[in-house]
Amino acid sequence: MPGQPTRDQVAALVDHTLLKPEATAADVVALVAEAADLGVYAVCVSPSMVPAAVSAGGVRVATVAGFPSGKHASAIKAHEAALAVACGAVEVDMVIDVGAALAGHLDAVRSDIEAVRCATSGAVLKVIVESAALLGLADESTLIGVCRVAEDAGADFVKTSTGFHPAGGASTRAVEVMASAVGGRLGVKASGGIRTATDAVAMLSAGATRLGLSGTRAVLEGLGQN
C-alpha cells in the first residue's frame, strides 16, 4: 500500500483476533461488538468459538485449523476446518507442518494444504507458514518454496505467523519475500507482534494485504482520525 494509509483503509484490512486459550464465549461476543465498532474486515477466533462469533452477528468470521503447532494429521485439520465452515466461518487460517517444510518435504506440505482446501470449498484459505522459523532455521529459498507450494495447492493467502511460535511473528523482511514469491496472485497476511500503527504501516508498505491484530484499537488510534 503506497503512502500513508488512513485509519479506515487499515481497518478494512484487519482480522481482529482472539485466539488465547482462556478466551470465553463472552469474550468473543465482546470481540465481535468491538470489531463492528472499529469497522474491521473480520474477526478471527478459535474453531470452538465460531458459533458464538457467528451468532453475535455483524462481521465476517475467520478461524484457524491445525493451530498453533501444525502437527495435526491432515485429515484432522481438514475436518476441523470443514466443521468451522459449516458453523459459519468464511475464512480459515491453517498452519503447515513447519518441520516438513524445513526437511524439504514440500510434497507433504502441498498435500496437507490440499486436504484443507478440498474441505473448505467456498471459504477463503490462508496458509500460515511461520516465516520467522523458516527464515531463522533455513533461508529465504525455503520460505519462497513454501509460498509457491501454497499457491499450487489452491490457497488464497499466505500468512506469516501464528503469533505463538518462539521464533517470533511477522517481519517486514518476511512479508517482502512472501509478497515477491506470490507476485500479487495471492494475498499476504502479516500477523504476530504487530502492536503499533508504525508496525502496521510498515507491514502494508512491505506488501501485506491483510493484518492480524489483537490490539486493533490501539493500532487504529495511532493512525488518528480521517
Swiss-Prot record:
Active site: 93 (proton donor/acceptor), 159 (schiff-base intermediate with acetaldehyde), 189 (proton donor/acceptor)
Pathway assigned to this chain's UniProt record: Carbohydrate degradation; 2-deoxy-D-ribose 1-phosphate degradation; D-glyceraldehyde 3-phosphate and acetaldehyde from 2-deoxy-alpha-D-ribose 1-phosphate: step 2/2
EC number from the UniProt entry: 4.1.2.4
Predominant location category: cytoplasm
Localization per Swiss-Prot or TrEMBL: Cytoplasm
SMART domains: DeoC
Alphabetical GO biological process terms: 2-deoxyribose 1-phosphate catabolic process; carbohydrate catabolic process; deoxyribonucleotide catabolic process
Short name of one Pfam family: DeoC
Entry keyword annotation includes DNA damage: no
Catalytic reactions of this protein: 2-deoxy-D-ribose 5-phosphate = D-glyceraldehyde 3-phosphate + acetaldehyde
Keywords: Cytoplasm, Lyase, Schiff base
GO CC entries: cytoplasm
Alphabetical list of NCBIfam families matching this protein: deoC
Family: Belongs to the DeoC/FbaB aldolase family. DeoC type 1 subfamily.
Record's protein name: Deoxyribose-phosphate aldolase
Organism for this UniProt entry: Mycobacterium marinum (strain ATCC BAA-535 / M)
Gene (name only): deoC
